[in-house]
Amino acid sequence: MLSFAASTRHVTRSQLLRAARRSYATESTSKKPSNLPLYLMGAGVAGLGTYFYLNSTGKSVITQEKSPLDPENFKDFKLKKIVPYNHNTSEFIFELPNNEASLLPVASCLVVRSSDPEALKDEKGKPIIRPYTPISPPEKQGELTLLIKKYDNGNASKHIHGLKEGDTLAIKGPIPKFPYKVNEFEEVALIGGGSGITPLYQIVTHALSNASNRTKFTLLFSNVTEADILLKSELEALQKKYPTKFNLVYMLDKPPAGWTGPTGYISKEVLQQHVAPASLNERVKVFVCGPPGQVAAVAGKKAGMKQGELGGILKELGYTEDQVYKF
């Protein structure tokens, strides 16, 4: 596994300047004051648009000058392989040209639409656009992997699940979300539900793969049944590899016989038991991602693309808006 500084793992300076003022549809992206400087620092260290990482010897290795993705325009990418994950979710592996890496900053997402804008529209006749967070690492060469759950009422997910190997999907990005910096926090809590695991997985794999990481992570991951747990083997492999840095807690609404973990909805008691206290102040960060109802209950509703006011159980427990981020 490669070890590299978080500040050198980003896209080019010009891409970030554009991405900071663009959204994935018609709205602007979140304008947190700290986001742009951190992203630009990563691009600036790399020089004039050159991406590099540090290998195990500490030597910088230049790999490519820019990401094959475009934060301003949709580009078609060929579907290389489909790997079924469970009864309603599959991994969609897209081919990146010239064996290039995506170079996505952490945390960020992509937005997708049909390669034929006329093929997937909403009731107002506008192309349907949806955000997804890749599960493949930014340095992965030649491939970009999306883990996508099929929803009966989700036209975008049904369209993607209808694709065949060799078809294309229009992708735009990256869309910067939270500029995660290794060792910025002592404790990080990741509260996720269902397919909301992907941005949380992006953060924890990025951090734990860095040999200098000292942050302790706790993932509280809720699902309906055990069969619904996405990335289960990957998460358990992380827990086994980093037992002192990663605590994994599953929570099920419909547990099997003999289940010993938490059950039902995420409660105040469960959060008090597993999440680092608000009294740690700037040393703790809580990331939340899941169905809108769950996010609202845990941390308050989002306001469109903006964070919205902090609410829910986390507010009751004394956390502040600076301590919580909602994907």
Predicted segments with their positions:
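N-terminal mitochondrial targeting presequence
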Residues: 1-36
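Reductase modules of NAD(P)H-dependent flavoproteins
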Residues: 26-32, 36-53, 220-327
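Short hydrophobic alpha-helical membrane-entry/anchor segments
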Residues: 48-64
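Ferredoxin-reductase
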Residues: 63-167, 223-225, 253-254
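A short, basic/flexible loop-to-alpha-helix module at the beginning of a structural domain
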Residues: 174-184
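Structural motif
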Residues: 187-189, 285
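Hydrophobic/small residue at the entry helix of a nucleotide-binding pocket
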Residues: 195-200, 294
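Histidine-anchored nucleotide/phosphate-binding helix
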Residues: 201-211
